[in-house]
Swiss-Prot record:
Belongs to the UPF0729 family. This is UPF0729 protein C18orf32 homolog. GO terms for cellular component: endoplasmic reticulum; lipid droplet. Residues 47-56 have a biased composition (Basic and acidic residues). InterPro entries: UPF0729_C18orf32-like. It comes from Bos taurus. Signal peptide: none annotated. Its main location: endoplasmic reticulum. Residues 1-37 are annotated as: Necessary for its localzation to the endoplasmic reticulum and lipid droplets.
Amino acid sequence: MVCIPCIVIPVLLWVYKKFLEPYIYPLISPFVSRMWPRKAIRETNDKNKGKVDYKGADINGLPTRGPTEMCDKKKD
């Protein structure tokens, strides 16, 4: 036996997607695009694209820029 929310939630999502979204989305999309602006994607023609310099790698393996230092003291 299937629980009631397992039936009702997909039906409500289908009704929203099929009938309500075409009317609601044009009203909401200008606000969403202001909140989450798209950033331009730049393609680089770098010859060293696959090579990574591991000298400045952080503890978790992510490359960092500039010197990294660990402070044990709190700064007030």
